[in-house]
Design a protein with these regions (language model features):
Chain B
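FAD-site-proximal beta/loop scaffold in flavoenzymes
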Residues: 235-258, 339-408, 415
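Feature captures the FAD/FMN-dependent oxidoreductase FAD-binding
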Residues: 63, 124-133, 181-229, 318-328, ...
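Glycine-rich dinucleotide-binding loop and its adjacent helix/turn
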Residues: 107-124, 182-199, 224-278, 379-396
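A conserved FAD-binding loop/helix module that cradles the flavin
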Residues: 271, 404-429
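Iron-sulfur cluster-binding cysteine motifs and their immediate structural context
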Residues: 37-58, 79-108, 154, 161, ...
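Rossmann-like dinucleotide-binding cores of NAD(P)H-dependent redox enzymes
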Residues: 152-196, 247, 272-318, 435-447
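N-terminal Rossmann-like FAD-binding beta1-loop-alpha1 element of flavoenzymes
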Residues: 128-154, 268-276
Length: 289, 559
């Protein structure tokens, strides 16, 4: 019974993440699975904050802080430099937020994916620009409150997982912090593959979503069990594997824990339920083929 | 002149964040705490149920049995006949059915008998002698606990064999003689002096007090109550407990073809089942409605399966005694709800009169104590021995428990009282102040683990199993046990259903869900983990993610 996760101690205590931060928990399993023979690339984001106030670092590995639009390009350069030096063991990982991935860093990521560059790209997706005061990103879900969508976001969340799978990269996976063993397994799997590997990790932002300090893992699991964020893997854009999917849990159980949804009326909740059900059914068809 | 350039270092990092004490942000800190499980709280013997089920889950059966017999020397008995309030309290009951605690206890109890496991012998021998009057569940339990503490114990029993209700009252098909004999033999191997066929009367007390340092009165309540309508001198009228005792001694009372049992409790149904096995048709007349009979629900189900007809909400108004038969004029009744629980005030419903005819009638309407003369030596009230919370009577050094005192009349309650009396006697003799273990349970009852504290994500639904039952036709052939014990596979899979409320099982969830790596595994600690005070930010994720409520968040003040 219980989880069994092998960790190498790369991620340090004393980092500056908020109490209960899901992103810090995700970073623990990402860098502790990749190990010290890794070079990190981090754009401006909470991840940059958690990486440590200069000159201290929370990660016992080299980390390069790049610009917001250039994570994938920077990782490309480092990976190619390592190859040119004959180093075939050091891994390169870009760890970026959803703003730096879905929006500002999307061009460089898409083109790196198209060229199948040899690095791992991990998006810690908290569905908004949480580091700068919770503005909306293209990852913010339909009707969620942010500082820049005070009446709720009028458009749905961009489906980046499917966009990245459509690049036909060797490995694409979704993960979330409520399932740490699954997250660590996916990072380990990505580590053993060459080419561009992409993992999008749903990391509930306690402050930006309006959650209790202890609610990160719980809301993360509800995202999965309601079908909002199914956990699955796609190899070469074709082979789909479902890890954890919808259990048919009503969407209200997920929404009611989050203050960013507290303005919703019953009709809007039902609208979200229909959207989630449709998305889940559309995705579910891909597992049977 | 040579131009100087400012050297830019290739690495800016000079150290790690673990020199930063983020623990200073905190206003609350997690505390690992063994907390009271609802089953443990409900258990009449104060049994640490989550502990022994956890050991059984690990297949450490001998250790599980050892944990059981700390509080109760007869797990194979209670695994059969306990009214198991633990299962009624079980947090899993609100989810997918309570854990089958009673059946698990039976499996472990039976295993101990078949493997010949022995009870631990006392580690010290004391000179003081204690007299236990009455060799039923309360007396034997008290004798056992006192013996464990090193006291010399003598049991005085008026009947030829020890066991009280376990030997003479419970039908063999609920508790076989072999099982009882096995449990008793193992207990007596601890070295307890027995005086059977030895009735202690009230005026023997002062001489006992000269020879013994303390006395425990566990006289029980074996006198069947009667009803004024019935003449107990008639050979066709039987008293319930006496009837069961005669059958348990091997007699075959002549009942005739049609038997009417009066009463609605467990004894009434035991009488009915016994009469069925002796070949009679059986009707049970009870004042209570069918859904509020005092008997246990599974006992009622078994009786109905065995063809016992239950006339619930019925009262006998007039008895017509004939030479061969008894004719009963009955009427349907409802019970006056204005009266407190336990007091029955039937209201006849006119026009519902009916007649029942029988070859014999067995009265099972409760039992009374036999305390003639005892009121001159100790305080008696309402035919029961008056005791304090520590089971001390009005006479110093004399304690009482079980059915002779105002307690619920269950075997397990009597066993629990025997244990409680033993610690009171020990305290009395060692003149300690009263901070007994049994009181600590009451103090902690506020802190019982609630259903809401169980993290259901970690407990996928898993169906509860029940003990099997021998087919009805086979049951009525003899007095063999009717309930079939769990097998090994059932025991394993059912013990896995226990939430282990408030009891850490080292699942490591608290360790894995800490974003600050502030939880450290340390198997040398009783609580298995420690918190790194300098890093813990007090988010409470470890508390929330503990599946079983074994970590609590404690606010810190004055930092």
């Amino acid at each position: 019974m219980g989880y069994q996760i092998n960790e190498e101690k790369v991620f340090n205590s004393g980092h500056a993440a908020c109490p209960g931060c899901s992103e810090a928990l995700a970073m623990r399993y990402i860098v502790n699975t990749l190990g010290p023979d890794t070079i990190g690339v981090v754009p401006p984001s909470c991840i940059a904050i958690i990486s440590g106030p200069q000159p201290l670092s929370s990660m016992r590995m080299p980390v390069y802080q790049t610009t917001l639009e250039a994570s994938a390009a920077s990782a490309t350069g480092i990976a190619r430099a390592l190859k040119a030096k004959g180093n075939d063991h050091t891994k390169v990982v870009a760890i970026a937020g959803d703003g730096g991935t879905y929006d500002i860093g999307f061009q460089s990521l898409s083109s790196a994916a198209e060229r199948n560059e040899d690095f791992i790209y991990i998006c810690l997706d908290n569905e908004g620009y949480m580091n700068t005061g919770a503005q909306k990103s293209s990852s913010t879900p339909y009707l969620a409150y942010t500082a820049s969508t005070p009446a709720g976001k009028p458009t749905p969340k961009k489906n980046l997982a499917e966009i990245m799978a459509a690049h036909r990269i060797p490995y694409m996976a979704t993960a979330t912090t409520g399932y740490p063993e699954d997250l660590a397994r996916k990072v380990a799997k990505a580590k053993g593959i060459r080419g561009l590997r992409f993992i999008v990790v749903l990391t509930p932002c306690l402050d930006g979503w309006g959650l209790a300090d202890n609610a990160g893992p719980k809301v993360s699991r509800l995202a999965v069990e309601t079908g909002v964020f199914p956990l699955y893997e796609v190899e070469n854009g074709e082979h789909y594997t479902l890890n954890y999917g919808s259990k048919g849990t009503p969407i209200n159980q997920y929404l009611s824990l989050q203050k960013r949804y507290r303005h919703l009326n019953q009709a809007q909740i039902e609208e979200i339920q229909i959207e989630v059900d449709n998305n889940w059914q559309r995705l579910h068809r891909k597992f049977s083929t | 002149m040579k131009e100087t350039f400012k050297e830019v270092p290739s690495i800016w990092t000079t150290g790690w964040t673990d020199i930063l004490n983020t623990g200073t942000w905190r206003s609350a800190i997690p505390i690992y705490q063994k907390r009271l499980a609802p089953c443990h709280s409900a258990c009449p013997v104060d049994g640490e149920i989550p502990t022994w089920i956890m050991l059984a889950r690990k297949q450490l059966y001998h250790e599980a049995w050892s944990a059981l017999v700390v509080n109760n020397p007869f797990p194979a008995v209670t695994g059969r006949i306990c009214h198991h309030p633990c299962e009624g309290a079980c947090n899993r009951g609100e989810y997918d059915g309570a854990v089958a605690i009673n059946a698990l206890e039976q499996y472990i109890g039976d295993l101990a008998l078949s493997e010949g496991w022995t009870l631990p012998h006392p580690t010290i021998e004391l000179d003081q002698r204690i007299a236990v009057i009455g060799g039923g569940p309360a007396g034997l339990s008290c004798a056992y606990q006192l013996r464990q503490l090193g006291y010399k114990v003598t049991i005085f029993e008026s009947r030829p064999e020890l066991g009280g209700v376990l030997r003479y009252g419970i039908p063999r098909y609920r508790l076989s003689k072999e099982i009882w004999d096995g449990e008793l033999k193992r207990l007596l191997a601890l070295g307890i002096e027995i005086k059977v066929n030895h009735l202690v009367k009230a005026n023997d007390l002062s001489s006992l007090e000269r020879d013994y340092s303390a006395v425990f009165l566990a006289l029980g309540a074996q006198n069947s109550k009667t009803l004024p309508q019935f003449s107990v001198d008639d050979l066709k009228v039987f008293k319930g407990y006496e009837f069961l005792e005669r059958v348990n001694r091997g007699e075959v009372p002549q009942l005739g073809q049609e038997v009417v049992v009066i009463g609605g409790g467990s004894v009434a149904l035991d009488v009915a089942g016994t009469a069925r096995r002796l070949g009679s048709q059986v009707k049970v007349l009870a004042l209570e409605a069918m859904d509020s009979l005092p008997a246990q629900p599974d006992e009622l189900t078994e009786s109905l399966e065995e063809g016992v007809e239950i006339y619930a909400g019925a009262m006998v108004q007039k008895v017509n005694l004939g030479p061969e038969r008894i004719s009963l004029d009955c009427i349907k009744v409802t019970l006056d709800e204005a009266f407190p629980a336990g007091v029955l005030r039937p209201i006849p419903r006119s026009g519902t009169e009916f007649n029942v005819s029988a070859t014999s009638v067995i009265l099972a309407v409760g039992q009374e104590t036999e305390l003639t003369g005892w009121d001159s030596v100790i305080n008696i009230g309402q035919s029961l021995v008056k005791v304090g919370a520590d089971l001390a009577t009005s006479r110093p050094g004399v304690f009482a428990g079980g059915d002779v005192t105002p307690a619920e009349r269950f075997v397990s309650t009597a066993i629990g009282q025997g244990k409680k009396a033993s610690s009171s006697i020990d305290r009395y003799l060692t003149e300690q102040t009263s901070d007994s273990q049994s009181l600590s349970k009451t103090e902690n009852s506020e802190d019982k683990v609630a259903y809401q504290e169980i993290n259901m994500f970690y407990f996928p639904e898993k169906a509860r199993e029940r003990k099997g039952l021998v087919p009805v036709e086979q049951r009525l052939q003899n007095f063999d046990e009717v309930r079939i014990s769990f097998n090994f596979e059932q025991t394993q899979s059912q013990s896995e259903r226990c939430f282990s409320c408030g009891n850490c099982v080292e699942c490591d969830n608290c360790f894995y869900f800490c974003p600050d790596m502030a939880v450290v595994k340390d198997s040398s600690l009783a609580e298995h983990y420690s918190i790194l005070d300098q890093y813990c930010k007090g988010c409470g994720s470890c508390v929330q993610e503990c599946p079983r409520g074994a970590v609590v968040l404690k606010e810190e003040t004055g930092r």
